[in-house]
């Protein structure tokens, strides 16, 4: 261990207090005789001035030592404290001088007092001057500090403004790039032209969008010039496509103008369409540069082509609807009498050829007349008769067993009988029954009209009320109307049949004769009467 000897200072040893030098003794030794002071005032003044300087230098030296030794709050002393020390020194000097004057002569005392007064006045003036200088220095230092602070603050504000300006500019640039609208293109291009460093402006867009590069103003102008050219070319192509479709439709109309609809559909072949397409392509190549397009010897303007295209689309819809109607036998635009005539003709053919209706329903026959007959048969069953039957049953309380009996027996007879106060066998309600219903006849197929001879002689008798009896009569007539009509057609065909004559000729002859003598109209009127009875049938009422 190395021991270091520390020098004693004021801070280290508090017990040992060094004796301060007496400034009064020093002045006494300086001023050995009062007579020297009386010789010349100038010498005294000069000596006094020197003494003051020495005092100031000594005191400043001691103050520096105290500042170095303390390193504490004494280092923050101000010029005001120094002025207080000077005043205390001057007062001590005045006291010393008074003592010296008292020890001298009386004459010298007065002179000395005058000099001291002058000296005090000079000292006061010096103090005022020093205080003014200190105030000026403080003001100057305060102004300098304020100026420095203002400069520092202004520099910080400028830096902040620059940084914020740069951030705002960056944000604006990013916003311009993200929007990517054509309206913002001019502003972005101006910024790129003003900057000396960047000649090419690259837009940043999303991941899925392609990157757009704008090089010059001239390139944007070229793009704007190209876009209308592209739109014009696209419009021309669309017009040509519309005109091609229109020419195809017109050519088809010309081919099918003198023919039937179905025959024209069968005879139209794709080869003619391909030839038309080749001719139209040649016309397209020859007339590609023109404003108007001439195809198939006719000129079509823009608006006229659109209107005709709409008309052709409407015609297409109507033809497709007709096709659907012919495919679906439930829908037809023919009148009721036309359907009835077709039904009569189909029944006449089946009377001569019993397999005709079977092949018609199973789809074996695909000719147009066969499809028309099938449509009319469906129309009679499903549009004329079946809705009325359903309404009659729905408004009654018929038992299911009674309804099946009425449907399966082709013959019915209703008779009056002695009234009985009993329950009706049709609806099950307690009635005053005075009618008896007799059901008989063969069972048959409602489509092919083939008779089933099983239990052909069976009969059923039911006791019913007045309402159920009249309802049974209408229901049975509508349900078995087609079978009764078929039986009459069979009897006519048996009487009018001629040997060595084809079925088609026989049917045409019988049908023409039946139409001439009014038999078909008579049967159609009978059907309408039954339908009207079913429509206006009254509700069931309880009899008292």
Curated annotation (Swiss-Prot):
<feature type="coiled-coil region">
    <location>
        <begin position="229"/>
        <end position="256"/>
    </location>
</feature>
<feature type="compositionally biased region" description="Polar residues">
    <location>
        <begin position="88"/>
        <end position="108"/>
    </location>
</feature>
<feature type="modified residue" description="Phosphoserine">
    <location>
        <position position="329"/>
    </location>
</feature>
<feature type="modified residue" description="Phosphoserine">
    <location>
        <position position="131"/>
    </location>
</feature>
<feature type="compositionally biased region" description="Basic and acidic residues">
    <location>
        <begin position="16"/>
        <end position="27"/>
    </location>
</feature>
<keyword id="KW-0597">Phosphoprotein</keyword>
<keyword id="KW-0175">Coiled coil</keyword>
<feature type="region of interest" description="Disordered">
    <location>
        <begin position="1"/>
        <end position="294"/>
    </location>
</feature>
<dbReference type="Pfam" id="PF13846">
    <property type="entry name" value="DUF4196"/>
</dbReference>
<feature type="compositionally biased region" description="Basic and acidic residues">
    <location>
        <begin position="112"/>
        <end position="132"/>
    </location>
</feature>
<dbReference type="InterPro" id="IPR025244">
    <property type="entry name" value="CCDC82"/>
</dbReference>
<feature type="modified residue" description="Phosphoserine">
    <location>
        <position position="219"/>
    </location>
</feature>
<protein>
    <recommendedName>
        <fullName>Coiled-coil domain-containing protein 82</fullName>
    </recommendedName>
</protein>
<feature type="compositionally biased region" description="Basic residues">
    <location>
        <begin position="1"/>
        <end position="14"/>
    </location>
</feature>
<feature type="modified residue" description="Phosphoserine">
    <location>
        <position position="195"/>
    </location>
</feature>
<feature type="modified residue" description="Phosphoserine">
    <location>
        <position position="88"/>
    </location>
</feature>
<feature type="compositionally biased region" description="Basic and acidic residues">
    <location>
        <begin position="223"/>
        <end position="248"/>
    </location>
</feature>
<feature type="compositionally biased region" description="Acidic residues">
    <location>
        <begin position="273"/>
        <end position="294"/>
    </location>
</feature>
<dbReference type="GO" id="GO:0005634">
    <property type="term" value="C:nucleus"/>
</dbReference>
<feature type="compositionally biased region" description="Acidic residues">
    <location>
        <begin position="39"/>
        <end position="67"/>
    </location>
</feature>
<feature type="modified residue" description="Phosphothreonine">
    <location>
        <position position="227"/>
    </location>
</feature>
<dbReference type="Pfam" id="PF13926">
    <property type="entry name" value="DUF4211"/>
</dbReference>
<feature type="modified residue" description="Phosphoserine">
    <location>
        <position position="154"/>
    </location>
</feature>
<dbReference type="InterPro" id="IPR025451">
    <property type="entry name" value="DUF4211"/>
</dbReference>
């Amino acid at each position: 261990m190395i021991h270091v000897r520390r020098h004693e200072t004021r801070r280290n040893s508090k017990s040992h207090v060094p004796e301060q030098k007496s400034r009064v003794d020093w002045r006494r030794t300086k001023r050995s005789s009062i007579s020297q002071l009386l010789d010349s005032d100038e010498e005294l003044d000069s000596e006094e001035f020197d003494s003051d300087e020495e005092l100031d230098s000594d005191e400043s030296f001691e103050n520096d030592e105290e500042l170095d030794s303390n390193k504490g709050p004494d280092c923050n002393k101000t010029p005001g404290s120094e002025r207080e020390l000077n005043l205390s020194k001057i007062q001590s000097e005045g006291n010393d001088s008074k003592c010296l004057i008292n020890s001298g002569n009386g004459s010298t005392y007065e002179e000395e007092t005058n000099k001291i007064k002058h000296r005090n006045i000079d000292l006061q003036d010096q103090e005022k001057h020093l205080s003014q200088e200190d105030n000026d220095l403080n003001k100057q230092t305060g102004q300098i500090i304020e100026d420095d602070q203002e400069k520092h603050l202004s520099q910080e504000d400028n830096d902040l403004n620059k940084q914020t300006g740069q951030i705002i500019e960056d944000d604006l640039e990013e916003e311009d790039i993200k929007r990517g609208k054509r309206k913002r293109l001019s502003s972005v291009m101006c910024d790129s032209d003003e900057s000396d460093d960047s000649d090419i402006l690259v837009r940043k867009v999303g991941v899925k969008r392609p990157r757009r590069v704008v090089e010059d103003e001239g390139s944007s102008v070229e793009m704007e010039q190209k876009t209308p050219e592209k739109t014009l070319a696209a419009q021309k192509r669309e017009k040509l496509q519309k005109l091609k479709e229109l020419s195809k439709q017109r050519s088809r109309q010309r081919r099918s103008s003198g023919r039937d609809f179905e025959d024209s559909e069968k005879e139209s072949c794709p080869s003619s369409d391909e030839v038309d397409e080749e001719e139209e392509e040649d016309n397209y190549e020859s007339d590609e540069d023109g404003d108007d397009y001439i195809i198939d010897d006719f000129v079509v303007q823009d608006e006229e082509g659109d209107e005709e295209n709409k008309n052709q689309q409407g015609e297409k819809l109507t033809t497709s609807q007709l096709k659907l109607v012919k495919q679906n036998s439930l829908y037809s635009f023919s009148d009721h009498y036309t359907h009835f005539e077709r039904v009569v003709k189909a029944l006449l053919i089946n009377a001569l050829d019993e397999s005709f209706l079977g092949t018609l329903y199973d789809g074996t026959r695909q000719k147009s007349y066969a499809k028309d007959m099938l449509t009319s048969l469906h129309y009679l069953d499903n549009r004329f008769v079946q809705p009325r039957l359903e309404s009659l049953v729905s408004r009654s309380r018929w038992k299911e067993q009674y309804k099946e009996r009425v449907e399966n027996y082709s013959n019915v007879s209703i008779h009056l009988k002695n009234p009985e106060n009993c329950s009706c066998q049709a609806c099950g309600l307690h009635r005053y029954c005075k009618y008896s219903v007799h059901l008989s006849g063969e069972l048959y197929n409602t489509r092919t009209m083939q008779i089933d001879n099983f239990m052909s002689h069976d009969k059923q008798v039911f006791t019913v009320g007045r309402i159920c009896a009249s309802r049974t009569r209408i229901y049975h007539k509508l349900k078995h109307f087609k079978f009764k009509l078929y039986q009459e057609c069979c009897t006519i065909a048996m009487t009018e049949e001629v040997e060595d004559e084809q079925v088609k000729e026989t049917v045409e002859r019988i049908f023409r004769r039946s139409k001439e003598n009014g038999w078909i109209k008579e049967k159609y009127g009978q059907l309408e009467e039954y339908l009207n009875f079913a429509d206006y049938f009254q509700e069931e009422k309880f009899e008292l």
